[in-house]
């Protein structure tokens, strides 16, 4: 995937990432997983987004990078969330990767290990050291196109954003592969 792919808005990239591969190398071993669920966060106008209203802090600074960088943060003092920054620099949009399907044969196929954003980061050993990493050309964590993209996409409301304004709560900016058993919630 090239930089241009990530310069599109978060809702577009969130859909296009489905079915593609997230690859993590640990100790020279490659863990390959298919992205099966995403959520789009559309920046300063989206009250569910960390950059809502132009908010810029040490935590959210990665969102202001050019598309193709990672945005990793911790919630509840224990779970890391992995996001892909989209759009132009200083247009802070991101896609939360909510669930993945392990592809590497040695990993097994236990959905309970990767069917949520905190679970997948634990599974892939993603922590704050991966915040603000350029995912293009990185050799430890990167995205790759997959040619097997024959599936239906379900659009639904995002999860756990009760703090947002009602119109943002009701936007169908969560996307997942229909009938995939690794999706966190249906």
Swiss-Prot record:
GO terms for biological process: base-excision repair. It holds the Pfam family Pur_DNA_glyco. It is an enzyme of class 3 (hydrolase). Transmembrane segments: none annotated. SUPFAM superfamilies: FMT C-terminal domain-like. InterPro entries: Formyl_transferase-like_C_sf, MPG, MPG_sf. GO terms for molecular function: alkylbase DNA N-glycosylase activity; DNA binding. Gene3D superfamilies: Methylpurine-DNA glycosylase (MPG). It comes from the Bacteria. The keyword Hydrolase applies. Its EC number is 3.2.2.-. Keywords: DNA damage, DNA repair, Hydrolase. Belongs to the DNA glycosylase MPG family. This is Putative 3-methyladenine DNA glycosylase. It comes from Borrelia garinii subsp. bavariensis (strain ATCC BAA-2496 / DSM 23469 / PBi).
